[in-house]
From Swiss-Prot:
TM helices/strands, residue ranges: 127-144
Free-text disruption phenotype from the record: Abnormal activation of TORC1 signaling. Abnormal punctate localization of TOR1. Sensitive to high hydrostatic pressure (mechanical stress).
Keywords: Autophagy, Membrane, Protein transport, Transmembrane, Transmembrane helix, Transport, Vacuole
Protein name per UniProt: Protein SLM4
GO cellular component: cytoplasm; fungal-type vacuole membrane; late endosome; late endosome membrane; Ragulator complex
Protein transport keyword on record: yes
A Pfam family hit: SLM4
Membrane topology summary: Single-pass membrane protein
Organism, scientific name: Saccharomyces cerevisiae (strain ATCC 204508 / S288c) (Baker's yeast)
Miscellaneous field: Present with 3490 molecules/cell in log phase SD medium.
Principal location class: membrane
Name of the gene encoding the protein in the UniProt record: SLM4
Function: Component of the GSE complex, a GTPase complex required for intracellular sorting of GAP1 out of the endosome. Component of the EGO complex, a complex involved in the regulation of microautophagy.
Length: 162
């Protein structure tokens, strides 16, 4: 049985926030706003990292920011759950089936207000990996970024809660 170590998970999520810098085409993205591991059952946040380091710890702004993340994770989890059960949605432009080490999963992209989001179930687990980026962050790069991140989470494939 694999145990989640919060320091390792937090470090991983912080690394996923880094921007893309494509030298060959002179293109650089902003950092992700947030990276989270949430439960597929109820959308609860297990761990998260944000790129907004300007917010003082334990301030009202930090509390509001965390509350916003909680609300967004619930909304995304509900949308993901709907789409997982809707075979038509799985053939849309916002669903990207991927295979990682013979495990299959689907990456979904969504727009929430002025943000781009990307979510994927860690294969055969009760966990979702969720990225939130500015609206200018290209969906295609967001999908590539989450797929590469998933390849680093193979120890969590099959992870079940409780």
């Amino acid at each position: 049985m694999v145990m989640l170590h919060s320091k390792n998970v937090k470090g991983f999520l912080e690394n996923t926030l880094k921007p893309y810098d494509l030298h060959s085409v002179d293109f650089k993205t902003s950092s992700l706003q947030s990276s989270m591991i949430i439960t597929a059952t109820n959308g609860g946040i297990l761990s998260y990292a944000t790129s907004n380091n300007d917010v003082p710890k334990n301030s009202i702004n930090e509390i509001n920011s965390v509350n916003n993340l909680k609300m967004m994770s619930l909304l995304i989890k509900d949308k993901w759950s709907e789409d997982e059960n809707d075979t038509e949605e799985q053939h849309s432009n916002s669903c990207y089936p991927v295979e990682i080490d013979s495990f299959k999963t689907k990456i979904y992209t969504y727009e929430m207000e002025d943000l781009h989001t990307c979510v994927a179930q860690i294969p055969n687990s009760d966990l979702l990996l969720l990225f939130i980026a500015e609206g200018s962050f290209p969906y295609g790069l967001l999908v590539i970024k989450i797929e590469r991140a998933m390849r680093e989470l193979t120890d969590l494939f099959g992870y079940k809660l409780g």
